[in-house]
Amino acid sequence: MADTTGRIPLWLIGTVAGIPVIGSVGVFFYGSYSGLGSSL
């Protein structure tokens, strides 16, 4: 493992940033299939 002292690992940034994005896209498509896409 490389020394990441004072630095934030890129995989951590990707995970933290990716979860809300994937969740938002998932909710958007779920709402569209449920007929609630217009409310978004």
Swiss-Prot record:
GO cellular component, one term: chloroplast thylakoid membrane
Record GO biological process: photosynthesis
Membrane protein topology class: Single-pass membrane protein
Cross-referenced InterPro entries: PSII_PsbJ (IPR002682), PSII_PsbJ_sf (IPR037267)
Spans traversing the lipid bilayer: 8-28
Keywords: Chloroplast, Membrane, Photosynthesis, Photosystem II, Plastid, Reaction center, Thylakoid, Transmembrane, Transmembrane helix
Coiled-coil intervals: none
Compartments it resides in: Plastid, Chloroplast thylakoid membrane
Origin superkingdom: Eukaryota
Biological role: One of the components of the core complex of photosystem II (PSII). PSII is a light-driven water:plastoquinone oxidoreductase that uses light energy to abstract electrons from H(2)O, generating O(2) and a proton gradient subsequently used for ATP formation. It consists of a core antenna complex that captures photons, and an electron transfer chain that converts photonic excitation into a charge separation.
The family this protein is said to belong to: Belongs to the PsbJ family.
Assembly and interaction partners: PSII is composed of 1 copy each of membrane proteins PsbA, PsbB, PsbC, PsbD, PsbE, PsbF, PsbH, PsbI, PsbJ, PsbK, PsbL, PsbM, PsbT, PsbX, PsbY, PsbZ, Psb30/Ycf12, at least 3 peripheral proteins of the oxygen-evolving complex and a large number of cofactors. It forms dimeric complexes.
UniProt-recorded name of the protein: Photosystem II reaction center protein J
Organism from which the protein derives: Acorus calamus
